[in-house]
């Protein structure tokens, strides 16, 4: 009887410990969001075969930019990737493993995967563009896939952003 209590206590402690160690979306945000977004693009036939998942991921990576592109590089989804741990993504996805668990396994293989973080978005409706640095103004345009040909002064960048703002800003009511 006493031994069974000890075994139950150990099982409880291990269970609580595993829950505490479980990866949260904020801990590995780029990985979790990218894996979820990629998994949503797969059809039922592709989801069952890890080789097809790998091929689909390489195709998916060709269209990615910024942090997602870096994530693809780390996994081996790009031609120029130095290493490849793509099977650590494709096999668990073929077993219908949730994105959080997939990223947990990937983190064990390569910790820098979870070091990727999204940059905080600038709220264009509330920020004073004149107080931003030129680097930040350029980043806004770059995020929009827009350029500012002939822009030399800060005021030129601000003028260009103001021109494009109605096209890209999200007005929340």
From Swiss-Prot:
Localization annotation: Secreted
Main location (coarse class): secreted
SUPFAM superfamilies: SAP domain
Keywords: Developmental protein, Disulfide bond, Secreted, Signal
GO cellular component: endoplasmic reticulum; extracellular space; synapse
InterPro entries the UniProt entry points to: ARMET-like, ARMET_C, ARMET_N, EF_Hand_1_Ca_BS, EF_hand_dom, SAP_dom_sf
Top-rank taxon: Eukaryota
Disulfide bonds: 28-114, 31-103, 61-72, 148-151
GO biological process, one term: neuron cellular homeostasis
Molecular function terms, GO-annotated: calcium ion binding
Residues making up the signal peptide according to the UniProt record: 1-22
Keyword Nucleus annotated: no
Function: Required during the maturation of the embryonic nervous system for maintenance of neuronal and cuticular connectivity. Essential for maintenance of dopaminergic neurons and dopamine levels.
Family as reported in the entry's similarity comment: Belongs to the ARMET family.
Protein name in the entry: Mesencephalic astrocyte-derived neurotrophic factor homolog
Organism: Drosophila virilis
Record gene name: Manf
């Amino acid at each position: 009887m006493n031994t069974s209590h000890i075994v139950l206590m150990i099982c409880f402690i291990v269970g609580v410990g595993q829950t505490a160690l479980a990866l949260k979306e904020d801990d590995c945000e780029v990985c979790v969001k990218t894996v979820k977004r990629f998994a949503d693009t797969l059809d039922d036939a592709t989801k069952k075969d890890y080789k097809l998942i790998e091929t689909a991921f390489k195709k998916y990576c060709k269209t990615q930019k910024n942090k997602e592109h870096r994530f693809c590089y780390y996994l081996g989804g790009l031609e120029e990737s130095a290493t490849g741990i793509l099977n650590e993504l494709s096999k668990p996805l073929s077993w219908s493993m949730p994105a959080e668990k997939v990223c947990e396994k990937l983190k064990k293989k390569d910790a820098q995967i979870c070091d990727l973080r999204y940059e905080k978005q600038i709220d264009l409706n509330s920020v004073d563009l004149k107080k931003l640095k030129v680097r930040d103004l350029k980043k806004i345009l770059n995020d929009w896939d827009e350029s500012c040909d002939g822009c030399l002064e800060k005021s030129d960048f601000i003028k260009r952003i103001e021109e494009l703002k109605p096209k890209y800003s999200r007005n929340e009511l």
